[in-house]
Regions:
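Exported/periplasmic ABC-transporter solute-binding proteins
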Residues: 4-148
């Protein structure tokens, strides 16, 4: 069973000096964009969006984690970075999130299940029920996760 989803979002400095409003803006001349390396999930998802849109990004840096991407944006080394919506939410007022509709082509969906070999299947099922119940879904939504 899937319990949550996460989509890409563009992280920009709070004042958005490069005036980024779309994924295509990231390919404009002079825009310094940072992405995750292709072997990390956020990098793979970014490549998927590039392929589906025909927008070719020329990043100034490919990082090994979303934290590193966010650090480049918050330090002023980049005008924008492509990360997950949840990462933008976690960063608080350090960045502004710019959603873009093309991210729907690269949604990460997260599964949850009680393992067959679990030592305490009853407790495991209670946890699954908590995460997938109303309270769990609200906590996930508050963190920026979407419905599965």
């Amino acid at each position: 069973m899937n319990f949550a989803s996460n989509t890409l979002e563009i992280a920009v400095p709070p004042d958005n000096p490069a005036r980024i409003t779309s994924f295509a803006d990231l390919a404009e001349d002079g825009v310094k964009v940072v992405v995750c390396a292709p072997q990390v999930p956020c990098g793979s998802a970014t490549q998927k969006v590039e392929t589906s849109t025909g927008v070719d990004l020329t990043p100034v840096s490919e990082e090994s984690s979303v934290t590193d991407v966010l650090n480049k944006v918050t330090s002023g080394e980049a005008d924008a970075g492509v990360v997950y919506r949840t990462d933008v939410r976690t960063a608080g007022d350090k960045v502004l999130g710019v959603p873009f509709p093309e991210s729907s082509g690269a949604v990460n969906v997260y599964p949850i299940a009680v393992l067959a070999g679990s030592k305490d299947t009853e407790l495991a099922q209670e946890f699954v029920d908590l995460v997938t119940g109303d309270d769990g879904r609200q906590v996930l939504a508050d963190a920026g996760f979407g419905k599965p």
